[in-house]
Amino acid sequence: MAKLTKAKRGKNRWIGLSIRDSDISRTELSHLLEARLQGKGWKLFDLQKHENYKVAIIKTTLEDSSEVRDRINSTDDLSTITTSGKIRLVRARITDE
């Protein structure tokens, strides 16, 4: 089967998150995001520790990205830092924070 062209693959958004709990594991964060983002497509890519908090990067569709950001920002323990169509830019921005 032929590979889909770039235009037919759909657009994604990468969202950089800040997590207050510096001891949260990847599994715990996945469960937390599952509860918050029910019905929305997402995938956890990176989870790194900074000074007294952790940062993560999730991938979501362009169509769901606004709703996903709103749901994440509606909680006290999670907040979005940046959003982009390229993971490289999100990684650069969250490491500069």
Language model segments and positions:
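Short glycine-/aliphatic-rich beta-strand segments at the starts of folded cytosolic domains
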Residues: T5-D23
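Short amphipathic alpha-helix segments
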Residues: D23-K43
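Short amphipathic alpha-helices in soluble, non-transmembrane regions
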Residues: L29-L33, V68-D76
